[in-house]
Amino acid sequence: MDPIKHISLPVLVLFLLLSVSAGQPGTPDQRHDPYAYSGSLSPAMAVVVVVVIAALFFMGFFTVYIRHCTGAVDGSVTPAGGARRRVTNATVARGLDAETIETFPTFVYSEVKTQKIGKGALECAICLNEFEDDETLRLLPKCDHVFHPHCIGAWLQGHVTCPVCRTNLAEQTPEPEVVVETDLEAQQQSAVPVPVVELPRVKFPRSHTTGHSVVLPGESTDRFTLRVPEELRKKIMANWKLNRSNSVFVLPRGGSSRSGKQVDRSRAKSDRWLFRKTPSFLWRNRDDGSIRLGGTGSVRGNSVTSPSGDSVRADRWAFLRNPSFLWRNTTPVPSPRVEVNNKDGEGTSSVQHIGTVGSTSGSLRLPV
């Protein structure tokens, strides 16, 4: 029925009742009695009552209409429930992390092509393409199914099961425990292990309309399965673990840790700095014999004799007074000219005084 008819009918009835009550005159007793109740209603009051009733009626009508249009007539679905359902679905759709995916071994197809069991070609169950000899395969150790690394990587980001056999790849296979029963009398005897009987898991068939598997029930999965001898399988797993361990540790290179360059030890003695600082001269001598430095001091054997008469070891630094300048000796022989005179089996050497840089026998150059 038309909603306007529902609205007009009560309003007309209300107006009729108001007009009838207003047209009835009061009794004489009620007009003279000051406390008597007057049943008359003014027209303004009647209009106010009608407007209020009509407003309430329209509010209820539009409320029902809006709820009907939004599809929430029964009010059973709430926003909180919808948000909770979306969070639950997102949690269920979460797959394996990248570290777990990288633990599955990879190898080149040509390494196992001639040794695999079976004559048929291997295919990737996700892209349904045959493997080429130079392509890399990723093996799932729990079910021996092989895929392209990028194909199975994209699948495992949203799933935790194998796309062929639905094996849960996130579960860790527990090792069977051995229970040993002993008592006081059997402590000296060998323990008897009690075998643990494990019941096989029974999986009920599921509907294939949810997209949890890429292989139809009853379809042959031999072309997706890599069957190789057990020795070759162990070798593949061992090589994969070795490659992963080598990729983590890097051996340091040999050589000097300071400059990274090899040092020519033959020129280490002669190619050094000679420092002259006013009022002293600094020089280190590691040779044997007696060396006289311009009359300022001498070295005999392994000791240095200064003008004051003090002696120090020749392999230490000697400070002598001389003019100050700095040069570097680049020749493989000592820069001062040394004269050797053997007297009584004692080696004596004298060094001419170095007045200028050009007076040395070796090539001396000032540092830039």
Curated annotation (Swiss-Prot):
One Pfam family it belongs to: zf-RING_2
Annotated source species: Arabidopsis thaliana
Catalytic activity: S-ubiquitinyl-[E2 ubiquitin-conjugating enzyme]-L-cysteine + [acceptor protein]-L-lysine = [E2 ubiquitin-conjugating enzyme]-L-cysteine + N(6)-ubiquitinyl-[acceptor protein]-L-lysine
Zinc finger (RING-type) boundaries: 124-166
Domain notes from UniProt: The RING-type zinc finger domain mediates binding to an E2 ubiquitin-conjugating enzyme.
GO terms (BP aspect): cellular response to hypoxia; cellular response to nitrogen levels; defense response to bacterium; defense response to other organism; protein ubiquitination; response to abscisic acid
GO cellular component, one term: membrane
Gene: ATL31
Residues the record lists as Phosphoserine modifications: S247
Biased composition (Polar residues): 347-368
Pathway per the UniProt entry: Protein modification; protein ubiquitination
Cited function: E3 ubiquitin-protein ligase that is required for the plant C/N response during seedling growth transition. May be involved in the early steps of the plant defense signaling pathway.
Region (Disordered): 342-368
Domain of life: Eukaryota
UniProt membrane topology term: Single-pass membrane protein
SMART domains membership: RING
Gene deletion effect: Hypersensitivity to C/N conditions during post-germinative growth.
Entries under InterPro entries matching the protein: RING-H2_zinc_finger (IPR053238), Znf_RING (IPR001841), Znf_RING/FYVE/PHD (IPR013083)
GO molecular function: ubiquitin-protein transferase activity; zinc ion binding
Ranges that cross the membrane: 46-66
Protein name, entry field: E3 ubiquitin-protein ligase ATL31
Leader sequence segment: 1-23
